[in-house]
């Protein structure tokens, strides 16, 4: 087994400091070390919710999606989540039936640990492809992570890093009516960054009260203009995943109806803040592109449609002549 020991030089485009983030009501964070691919670092992230959270997701378009992507895509139709589990270092991709079974074993173990249905637990993996997950080590780490669930978003962002040179996070606090709403996102990614996301994971958390179908529609739009609009090396991954979780705890129990329709007047502020967070995360991923020393934004004017404008922009972004 290859041990990932090398220390990566921090990107020259990295932010000078980690952002100050608001707390998100109903989100409990734990991290731990499985000692499976990395030594002496946290590589397991568990996030549990006080109550079932609305969930939305966008996944890789690769025709060979990794085992955890297949698992999440099956679960997402239920619309709600009790927990998120992420392991860094091993992607559980191109691992066949055993990889699918290992993913199921981990989900089954954690769902029993938190007294949840398995279909309400979401699993994500990132790292080296072609290796099986060390299930016993991960199970032990999951228990430690869950029992120590008093970590912050910075710890969470660090735990999911692989070849990243800095932890990535973004947050917004807005007011909807009389209620203060928080939106926080974390992400990882630095190589295999191409449109239709990248070798990347991104997780968005909010305490807004929003129905799953509407949340999914907003996430789709947000991904289109953020993670699906970046490129470093034009390669797409098998594990790309963006998941959004809405606990509703900033609004629930206050005689406030959930946001459920696109015409809801409260939605404008929320959508704008959500897209700001996602765009910030996407830009941070590009700034951490392997070997990147420059960041450019391509603007296309007078195109006949958004899709045609994007085709032009992507062809420019992926051109070796432009990059050199």
Locations of regions flagged by a protein language model:
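Phosphate/pyrophosphate-binding loops at sites that engage ATP/ADP/AMP, CoA/4′-phosphopantetheine
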Residues: 73-78, 111-118, 283-290
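Short, surface-exposed loop/turn segments at secondary-structure boundaries that line and modulate
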Residues: 84, 89-97, 119-138, 231-254, ...
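Short beta-strand elements
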Residues: 44-50, 71-75, 84-85, 172-176, ...
């Amino acid at each position: 087994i290859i041990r990932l020991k090398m220390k990566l030089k921090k990107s020259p485009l990295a932010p000078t400091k980690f952002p100050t983030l608001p707390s998100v009501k109903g989100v409990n964070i734990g991290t731990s070390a499985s000692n499976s691919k990395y030594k002496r670092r946290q590589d397991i992230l568990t996030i549990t919710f006080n109550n079932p959270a609305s969930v939305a997701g966008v996944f890789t378009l690769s025709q060979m999606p990794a085992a955890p992507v297949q698992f999440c895509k099956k679960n997402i139709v239920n619309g709600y989540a009790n927990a998120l589990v992420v392991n860094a270092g091993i992607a559980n991709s191109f691992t066949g039936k055993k990889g699918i079974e290992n993913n199921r074993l981990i989900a089954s173990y954690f769902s029993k640990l938190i007294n949840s249905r398995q279909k309400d637990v979401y699993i994500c993996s990132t790292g080296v492809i072609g290796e099986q997950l060390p299930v016993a080590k991960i199970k032990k780490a999951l228990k430690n992570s869950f029992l120590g669930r008093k970590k912050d978003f910075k710890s969470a962002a660090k735990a999911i890093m692989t070849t990243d040179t800095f932890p990535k996070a973004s947050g917004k606090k807005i007011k909807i009516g009389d209620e203060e709403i928080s939106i926080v996102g974390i992400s990882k990614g630095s190589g295999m960054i191409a449109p239709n996301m990248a070798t990347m994971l991104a997780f968005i958390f909010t305490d807004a009260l929003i129905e799953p179908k509407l949340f999914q529609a907003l996430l789709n739009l947000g991904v289109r203009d953020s993670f699906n609009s970046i490129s470093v090396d034009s390669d797409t991954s098998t594990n790309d995943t963006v998941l959004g979780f809405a606990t509703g705890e900033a609004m629930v129990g206050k005689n406030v109806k959930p946001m459920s329709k696109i015409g809801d007047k409260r939605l404008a502020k929320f959508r704008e803040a959500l897209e700001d967070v996602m765009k910030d995360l996407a830009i941070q991923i590009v700034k951490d592109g392997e070997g990147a020393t420059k960041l450019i934004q391509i603007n296309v004017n007078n195109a006949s449609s958004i899709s045609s404008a994007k085709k032009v922009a992507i062809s420019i972004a992926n051109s070796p002549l432009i990059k050199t």
